[in-house]
């Protein structure tokens, strides 16, 4: 009955809040612990080379912390309907190529080769440039963590959308649940020992894409994981 449905909805909301608090605590604790540890080491060593190394790690941890808080802030604004999209017409393929090329060094370090499939379609879409950048960065971070050596980027026309698909073989032993990749705080490592992932990147990305009038989906087929983003063509 109606009261039972309301009770179930309330329980689900409480569970989501609990998971959010647990996830947020875990994800903020990891970089803060690293910062605290290396600050203590800095106080104990005088070797210039070691101090430079520790400072670099501290800076990286601070950057991760800032990135996480930005994502949590965006997520809170989206879920409370306080965030409005600033939509513009732009070249989907040009934006994607520029963002991917900006990660060239990281792809090289991980030995991941990215191939862009040739296309002859007009990829002009309606999107918020800053939010699209956030979505693409999250997709790339996912690639860097789980891709096994290669990734392929393709575009296709599916009226009224232009579809971007990023497909990659996944590393052996990776536990990926396609049904859960867009859930808040889900990480492919179910034990949450993956200290590089906040677990909200793809969840936030899906919300952002939907806010731009598009769709975002994931698929796992024969060891190939693919993420698709559809934005309205102009």
Q: Where are the language model's segments positioned?
A:
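Short alpha-helical Gxxx[C/S/T] motif in the catalytic ATP-binding
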Residues: 201, 205
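Short conserved segment of the HATPase_c
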Residues: 173-186
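Conserved catalytic submotifs in the C-terminal HATPase_c
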Residues: 88-89, 113-123
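Short helix-loop "hinge" at the ATP-lid/N-box region of the Bergerat-fold HATPase_c
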Residues: 142-144
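Short beta-strand/loop element within the Bergerat-fold HATPase_c
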Residues: 150-161
